[in-house]
Amino acid sequence: MKFSELWLREWVNPAIDSDALANQITMAGLEVDGVEPVAGSFHGVVVGEVVECAQHPNADKLRVTKVNVGGDRLLDIVCGAPNCRQGLRVAVATIGAVLPGDFKIKAAKLRGEPSEGMLCSFSELGISDDHSGIIELPADAPIGTDIREYLKLDDNTIEISVTPNRADCLGIIGVARDVAVLNQLPLVQPEIVPVGATIDDTLPITVEAPEACPRYLGRVVKGINVKAPTPLWMKEKLRRCGIRSIDAVVDVTNYVLLELGQPMHAFDKDRIEGGIVVRMAKEGETLVLLDGTEAKLNADTLVIADHNKALAMGGIFGGEHSGVNDETQNVLLECAFFSPLSITGRARRHGLHTDASHRYERGVDPALQHKAMERATRLLIDICGGEAGPVIDITNEATLPKRATITLRRSKLDRLIGHHIADEQVTDILRRLGCEVTEGKDEWQAVAPSWRFDMEIEEDLVEEVARVYGYNNIPDEPVQASLIMGTHREADLSLKRVKTLLNDKGYQEVITYSFVDPKVQQMIHPGVEALLLPSPISVEMSAMRLSLWTGLLATVVYNQNRQQNRVRIFESGLRFVPDTQAPLGIRQDLMLAGVICGNRYEEHWNLAKETVDFYDLKGDLESVLDLTGKLNEVEFRAEANPALHPGQSAAIYLKGERIGFVGVVHPELERKLDLNGRTLVFELEWNKLADRVVPQAREISRFPANRRDIAVVVAENVPAADILSECKKVGVNQVVGVNLFDVYRGKGVAEGYKSLAISLILQDTSRTLEEEEIAATVAKCVEALKERFQASLRD
């Protein structure tokens, strides 16, 4: 935000120079980005009056003038400006004057005519880029007065970065409040005398969306002269704030916007049919905006309409049809409080960012509307004439923001600041900030001012007290603390160790947003309710993630769109699952997830191109699980997941509890997300794995191991993992290894069945096993498989 230093000093004028003022504003939390003079360096320019203006005898585009600058004679000056005319008060650079760029004014002859000075434009004085003509001063500008003094050009433009929580400082009044508080000075506000109604003209106003528009004020002003010139003082204040003068009506609403921080709008009353209706847009409704573009409105967009059509996007941009033009005589002034949530994101959807939407998205003082309406009415009538009707106020108190009541404890204040501030100082600071304060024993009850949306909790008051007291006034004190060594159990498995393993396997770690697109998330987790944000960055980031897959799959698409088809990425982070049993109704689980797609290996002349499959990812996952020492306790079970391919996925169970999923992304989901080719994902609940099984030292057998192979025929739906698990359980004392080395379907095996070839490794730590013992153990395994799975030995 830009503003004039002199305009600020009209409200509060501390006895400090510009640099100190800028530093003070920065230390108050409103970072000053720049301080620049409002005009170039020049001297010798005064107010003059063109007494005579005649055509130059030797040049069609030049005029010969006689100018009164308050001296004992008139000056002959040749001027080429198209707006030069008799009776005009102008800025005159006299002989000896020096203009910006070290341009010195001397007596000269132009096409044979003497010229004893120069009539200046704004650009020639370094005030603005306007070089369309010479400066036109008011008719009462005192002749001979230094133009720097008359236009108050010994001024600076201060530009500040206003953080989103300090919307109250998007007007001169807000910055002035802070400066007044910091310097313990009174705030000198302009006198705003209510304008009484002199006519009875009104328009009916209906608010159909009170949640989006808790307060709407409208006032008819009739008989205005829209062509009346905007006063130079107002033009200059607008210019120094970076706003170009348009016409008197628009300039007045912009002036109130900059002064009080309250957006306003003026409608051409004669173009409104019936009355004003504040409602949500109809799906597909269109509106031609003031810039001539057509906006297609969504049902969640607030509009100001008449009885037949939309007139404006509420709090964002006016419509062309109802806008003020050169023929306008009667206007309806609008001043409203729109809920920030009803405005947020709507302007960006249409490629807009207006001064009004910028303020409404952050929050406007809900108690400001009557004051702004009276200020705008007075300025409009003073400049354009006309008569005002009564103010129509439609307010829904139930939906207006409520002022927060906050308890500030002395113990909390001292602990967070680390310094004791006297009670009377704390009370004084809070009251100067605009709070209604009630003192108690070692605490304060403060009711936040209506313009401070960011004062909600105790820490906010602590911050305000410290800010106003001055961070530099808080003494440096060494921290007194004792160091306690953190305990580290042998069973603790660092997530960093797992990340290193995945890095070694070619994965890259990514970090994605916890805020995701609710529509995409519903594709991945259909029917699962997510936590929605009340004030999202955008609609596409309005839900908290239910898993890490949403962000990871979006990252894959992003990379594939940039010709990176072989992707291996992983992420660790929290998911947010609604749970009525959890604190605040949300369960936060630390998850580890990964995605792979593309070729199994990097391109190589000696390797065939093979696409990754389920077993590639399962193998990587087993390596991770092996680090935990719990691989032998993990089961991969066939279980449906709407995001995964039903025939190429599995749920992961640890001791009967599901801890994750692994599998190929469902083909339908691949299509919807525009994934290129087969994509595989996994996700694990990390906290259920972080407590690893500590390796136990055991004796290594000095006796030979024996291998026996068996082939068993089982039904197609029997998982091979269950077969291996049963063999391990039966041969627990002698079977030290079980491995599946072949799966066969075809000739010799009935349809609906499969043959599993299994190797059994048998060994004892105390002796060499006899053949009879080996045969007995193998037979025991076969019998167990036959009994549980109706397996039979294959011939």
UniProtKB/Swiss-Prot annotation:
Looking at the Swiss-Prot or TrEMBL record, what is one Pfam family this protein matches? B5
Q: Which organism is it from?
A: Escherichia coli (strain K12)
An example of a Gene Ontology cellular component annotation for this protein is: membrane
Protein name, entry field:
Phenylalanine--tRNA ligase beta subunit
Q: Which gene encodes it?
A: pheT
Record EC number:
6.1.1.20
- Answer whether the UniProt record assigns the keyword Membrane to this protein: no
InterPro entries per the UniProt record, alphabetical: aa-tRNA-synth_II/BPL/LPL, B3/B4_tRNA-bd, DNA-bd_dom_put_sf, Fdx_antiC-bd, Fdx_antiC-bd_sf, NA-bd_OB-fold, Phe-tRNA-ligase_IIc_bsu, Phe-tRNA-ligase_IIc_bsu_bact
GO terms for biological process, alphabetical: phenylalanyl-tRNA aminoacylation
**The tRNA-binding domain, residue ranges:** 39-148
Q: Provide any one GO MF term from the record.
A: magnesium ion binding
